[in-house]
Amino acid sequence: FTGLIAKIVTKMVKEPEKKEETAFRLKYINAGPLATPELATEQAIKEIIHFAEISRNGLGYARAAINENDSDKFEELRSKLVKYEEISDRIEYEIATFLNAVSTGEISESTMFKIKSMYKIIGELESLGDSGESISRILSRRNSHNKSFDAETIKKINSMIDIVDNAYRIMIQNLQLASEGRLTDISNAYNAEERINNFRNDLREEEINSLEDNRKNYQTSVYYMDVVSELEKMGDFMIN
């Protein structure tokens, strides 16, 4: 069991990486020998928290892309969001491979439960990376049709991102508490999701009213609501 994990992780570490990607390597899962499956799961949850922090950084790039008017700078940010999606895929795969190796050994029922939970968490974190890349594609389509968001629309999106970022903070905090065996209440997570949903509903209602009053361009509103919808999905991924 230990030898298998060592071989898998050694292969991960030795795979060539571009300089830009070195910050996204596995941080807590290493090629050293593991004493027990329990220790391995402790390392895995730390890696998952690190994964969540990387994912939160991706939201920052999405915000920057939404606020960027210069086409060249936007393309740089769009490329970063595509890269973050690829990084999320890779990290999910590497953690899942590690967990799979751990689960092949003799493990307790409680450890197996933890591993199953971790599989679900890394799947949701990977989906968060997909959402960031989806936002970049929505913005690219908007730009290709020579549409843009006015200052008020961008202000509303930034407010939505603030709420989503707070949900990220709560998710990471809860993961940390769970790793320490101190998580007893996750009502803060459900409250964060409800806040995201309520704000999404408010923005949608406002936009429908603006369209009915002919105060907004329909196609621009579609792009705007698509961005808001993608941000709302991110809240769902954090809670599921």
Task: Place the predicted regions along the sequence by residue.
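Cytosolic, long alpha-helical scaffolding segments
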Residues: 1-240
